[in-house]
């Protein structure tokens, strides 16, 4: 089994080659040609291969072990790939430099809608990406239930730059396991709608909730889906109006689109990448060292004991929207080659080896 789950039995090029070899001089009927096009497109979007199930993946991880050695060469190669495909240093967020007045951009999650940068949106962007690059030691914290009773909070807080996903709870009951430090926190517009009623009725609950993130950047995909633009702008104006410590950054749709294409070319086929994979991808392009926590999308832990889906609840995601096992296998591969470190064991039992 490939460690990344990338083996395919069919590809569009391979299928074309077979047709050309079997029928070198035959012209297919119009209906048959159209059917071939449909089949080849389907195979490209949904390649035929069997992904290992949860039990097989967990057993594979247990067999390989989690001991780790940093490989600066592997990390450097992957950082260069990120720079070449997606340019996170310049395109991670919307800025006055990459989104000037009058520029038209397409929503990355929709095919039919574009938007033009006008004065009202341009004024919300920073001049440039507001980080001192490269960032040194970064921690990307997912929300997996494997973090519960992990004791990883102290280790997470030792990072120079901490990224978190989807406005997670950081109250005192969780800090021992997930830490309290944050520098960048993502917020999907769907969360603003579900938890805070799109900020249409009361803003106080939202403002109070945000205080736990201190001086963090709040990273929002305002221009990913058209329905997400208005809630994202409300978040910006709400925090600005009350003089909150947080600063809103809007994801550049060109960056999100490029990250999606990058991982699709490596075998991840889903309606949408998870927020966690977007963040890890950005970190690999922005940071010298990357450690990830809570990236374990399975129902049992490393001892094959049942765990909750998140460290704070057991609410399951919508089925089929993300390809979490495929994403995990890609990240596990990066861990095994030393490009990043994936923390799966309790932190007090951490087994690290020197840099190579």
UniProtKB/Swiss-Prot annotation:
It is a single-pass type II membrane protein. The chain crosses the membrane at residues 30-48. Pathway: Protein modification; protein glycosylation; Lipid metabolism; sphingolipid metabolism. The keyword Glycoprotein applies. One of its GO terms (cellular component) is Golgi membrane. CMP-N-acetyl-beta-neuraminate binds at residues 143, 166, 274-276, 296, 310. Its EC number is 2.4.3.8. The keyword Cytoplasm does not apply. GO terms for biological process: N-glycan processing; oligosaccharide metabolic process; protein glycosylation; sphingolipid metabolic process. InterPro entries: Glyco_trans_29, Glycosyltr_29_Sialyltrsf, GT29-like_sf, Sialyl_trans. It comes from the Eukaryota. Keywords: Disulfide bond, Glycoprotein, Glycosyltransferase, Golgi apparatus, Lipid biosynthesis, Lipid metabolism, Membrane, Signal-anchor, Sphingolipid metabolism, Transferase, Transmembrane, Transmembrane helix. Glycans are attached at residues 71, 119, 214, 245. It catalyses: an N-acetyl-alpha-neuraminyl-(2->3)-beta-D-galactosyl derivative + CMP-N-acetyl-beta-neuraminate = an N-acetyl-alpha-neuraminyl-(2->8)-N-acetyl-alpha-neuraminyl-(2->3)-beta-D-galactosyl derivative + CMP + H(+); a ganglioside GM3 (d18:1(4E)) + CMP-N-acetyl-beta-neuraminate = a ganglioside GD3 (d18:1(4E)) + CMP + H(+); a ganglioside GD3 (d18:1(4E)) + CMP-N-acetyl-beta-neuraminate = a ganglioside GT3 (d18:1(4E)) + CMP + H(+); a ganglioside GD1a (d18:1(4E)) + CMP-N-acetyl-beta-neuraminate = a ganglioside GT1a (d18:1(4E)) + CMP + H(+). Gene3D superfamilies: Glycosyl transferase family 29. Residues 49-356 are lumenal. Residues 1-29 are cytoplasmic. It is found in: Golgi apparatus membrane. Belongs to the glycosyltransferase 29 family. This is Alpha-N-acetylneuraminide alpha-2,8-sialyltransferase. It comes from Bos taurus (Bovine).
């Amino acid at each position: 089994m490939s460690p990344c789950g990338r083996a395919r039995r069919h590809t569009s090029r391979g299928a074309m080659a077979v047709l050309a070899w079997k029928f070198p001089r035959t012209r297919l009927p119009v209906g048959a040609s159209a059917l071939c096009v449909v089949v080849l497109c389907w195979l490209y979007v949904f390649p035929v291969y069997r992904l290992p199930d949860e039990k097989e993946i967990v057993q594979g991880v247990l067999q390989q072990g989690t001991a780790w050695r940093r490989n600066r060469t592997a990390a450097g190669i992957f950082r260069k790939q990120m720079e070449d495909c997606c340019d996170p240093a310049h395109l991670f967020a919307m800025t006055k430099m990459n989104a000037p007045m009058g520029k038209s951009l397409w929503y990355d999650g929709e095919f039919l809608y574009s938007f033009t940068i006008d004065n009202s949106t341009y004024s919300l962007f920073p001049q440039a990406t507001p980080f001192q690059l490269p960032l040194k030691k970064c921690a990307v914290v997912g929300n997996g239930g494997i973090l519960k009773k992990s004791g990883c909070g102290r280790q997470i807080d030792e990072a120079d730059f901490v990224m978190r996903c989807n406005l997670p709870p950081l109250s005192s009951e969780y800090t021992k396991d997930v830490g309290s430090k944050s520098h960048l926190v993502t917020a999907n517009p769907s969360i603003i709608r579900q938890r805070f009623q799109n900020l249409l009725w009361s803003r106080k609950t939202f403002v109070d909730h945000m205080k736990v993130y201190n001086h963090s950047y709040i990273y929002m995909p305002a221009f990913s889906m058209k329905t997400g633009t208005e809630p994202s702008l409300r978040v910006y104006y709400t925090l600005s109006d009350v003089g909150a410590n947080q600063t809103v950054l809007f994801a550049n749709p060109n960056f999100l689109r490029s990250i999606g294409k990058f991982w699709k070319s490596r075998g991840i086929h889903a309606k949408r990448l998870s927020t966690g994979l977007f963040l890890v991808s950005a970190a690999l392009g922005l940071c010298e060292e990357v450690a990830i926590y809570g990236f374990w999308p399975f129902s049992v832990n490393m001892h094959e004991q049942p765990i909750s889906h998140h460290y704070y609840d057991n609410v399951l995601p919508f089925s089929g929207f993300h390809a979490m096992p495929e994403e995990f296998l890609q990240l596990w591969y990066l861990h095994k080659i030393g490009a990043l470190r994936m923390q799966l064991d309790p932190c007090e039992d951490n087994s690290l080896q020197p840099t190579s």
